[in-house]
């Protein structure tokens, strides 16, 4: 049976972790799966919830980072910490990435003609301004790397793409690292949900800085 590792960065997500585990368990019933929660030096109680879940469910493991490196550094660490899987899924902890879509990504990856499958972003899941600016970023990323123009950080990836991501530790973005690897990828449309709790840790300034750094990194590798 294919071994699936789901890698999730955690920062200020204490309120959604229990639901995340429960919904993944339902969505992945009948599959061999494991959840790697990467707590990104979160000061607000997420680590305690993650450790409690790991203590009661052997499918849940926790990586605790002592320095906050951001979403993409946490994803990279989580991928590195799950070497025994056959396929990997990266997703957010805030439930905007619906766990019920994970089998869709895995099944498309299992068709064998691509090495990564992105959840193509759909829906009114954040403010119009964030959707517009995020869409512009993804359009430029697509022009630079050949990524699908709706690609975000909810994706399933195979061994070659995981290796490419881990071989690019300086990349500010796991998504752009996948694009620069020039492996065959695709996307399937997935409606994102409105965040049920809290707000994004990404401020407008942080989003802009991340976009500029990651696009410049990709441009230099064309």
Q: Where are the regions a protein language model picked out?
A:
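Acceptor/aglycone-binding surface of glycosyltransferases and processive sugar-polymer synthases
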Residues: 66-67, 71-81, 99-172, 193-205, ...
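A conserved acidic beta->alpha catalytic loop
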Residues: 39-48, 95-96
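Catalytic donor-sugar/metal-binding loop of nucleotide-sugar-dependent glycosyltransferases
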Residues: 170-171, 175-193
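Short beta-strand/loop segment that forms part of the nucleotide-sugar
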Residues: 31-42, 63-64
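Cell-envelope/extracellular polymer assembly enzymes that use nucleotide-activated donors
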Residues: 3-5, 34
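Short, well-formed alpha-helical segments that are part of the catalytic scaffolds
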Residues: 13-27
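Short beta-strand-to-loop acidic/aromatic patch adjacent to the donor-nucleotide binding site
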Residues: 85-96
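Acidic helix N-cap motif at the loop->helix transition within catalytic regions
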Residues: 16-18, 44-53
């Amino acid at each position: 049976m294919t071994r699936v590792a789901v890698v999730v960065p955690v920062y200020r997500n204490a309120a959604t972790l229990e639901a995340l585990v429960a919904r993944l368990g339902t969505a992945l019933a009948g599959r061999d799966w494991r959840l790697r929660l990467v707590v990104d030096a979160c000061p607000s109680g997420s680590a305690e919830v993650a450790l409690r879940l790991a203590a009661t469910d052997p499918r849940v493991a926790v990586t605790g980072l002592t320095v906050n490196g951001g979403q993409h550094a946490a994803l990279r660490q989580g991928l590195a910490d799950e070497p025994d899987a056959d396929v990997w899924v990266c997703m957010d902890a805030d439930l905007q990435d619906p766990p019920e879509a994970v089998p869709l990504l895995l099944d498309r990856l299992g068709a064998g003609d691509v090495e990564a499958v992105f959840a193509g972003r759909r829906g009114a899941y954040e403010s119009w301004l964030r959707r517009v600016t995020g869409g512009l970023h993804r359009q430029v990323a697509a022009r630079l790397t050949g990524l699908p123009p709706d690609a975000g950080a909810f994706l399933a990836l195979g061994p070659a793409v995981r290796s490419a991501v881990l071989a690019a530790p300086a990349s500010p973005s796991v998504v752009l690292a996948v694009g620069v690897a020039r492996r065959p990828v695709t996307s399937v449309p997935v409606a994102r949900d409105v965040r049920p709790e809290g707000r994004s840790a990404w401020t407008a300034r942080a989003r802009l800085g991340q976009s500029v750094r990651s696009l410049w990194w990709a441009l230099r590798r064309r």
